[in-house]
Amino acid sequence: MSGSPPQLDPEIAARLKRTPDGLVPAIVQQYDTGEVLMLAWMDDEALRRTLTTRAATYWSRSRGEYWVKGATSGNTQRVVSVSLDCDGDTLLVKVDQTGGACHTGDRTCFDADRLL
């Protein structure tokens, strides 16, 4: 017996406003301090995987593939909550970050180049 692959809950999918290439920006924040860690991109499947496993899963625009944060680096994100903004076009993913969130190894992607 072969069923169709799991899909994102239709009620959630209907509320998402995606970019033309089917993506939604995800702001990632440390759940207990409010520190903004990074911005990543999700499509319906990345969001479904994140909600199902509580392991932060994103779509890599440069590599054209899914990636689970920390799968190779060990710098994991355990998802505590996911919220949709009032317009339905941005996700807020609150996580418990282990290690650095940035690909450079820094704690956050927003601490290297302060403009003001």
UniProtKB/Swiss-Prot annotation:
Keywords: Amino-acid biosynthesis, Cytoplasm, Histidine biosynthesis, Hydrolase, Magnesium, Metal-binding, Zinc
Enzyme Commission designation: 3.5.4.19
Name this protein carries in UniProt: Phosphoribosyl-AMP cyclohydrolase
Pathway(s) the chain acts in: Amino-acid biosynthesis; L-histidine biosynthesis; L-histidine from 5-phospho-alpha-D-ribose 1-diphosphate: step 3/9
EC top class named in words: hydrolase
InterPro entries for the chain: PRA-CH (IPR026660), PRib_AMP_CycHydrolase_dom (IPR002496), PRib_AMP_CycHydrolase_sf (IPR038019)
Assembly with partners or alone: Homodimer.
Binding site for Zn(2+): C86, C102, C109
Residues that, per the record, bind Mg(2+): D85, D87, D89
Cofactor(s) it depends on: Mg(2+); Zn(2+)
One of the GO BP terms on file: L-histidine biosynthetic process
Source organism: Thermobifida fusca (strain YX)
Record's keyword annotation contains Heme: no
Family: Belongs to the PRA-CH family.
Pfam families assigned: PRA-CH
GO terms for MF: magnesium ion binding; phosphoribosyl-AMP cyclohydrolase activity; zinc ion binding
Catalytic activity: 1-(5-phospho-beta-D-ribosyl)-5'-AMP + H2O = 1-(5-phospho-beta-D-ribosyl)-5-[(5-phospho-beta-D-ribosylamino)methylideneamino]imidazole-4-carboxamide
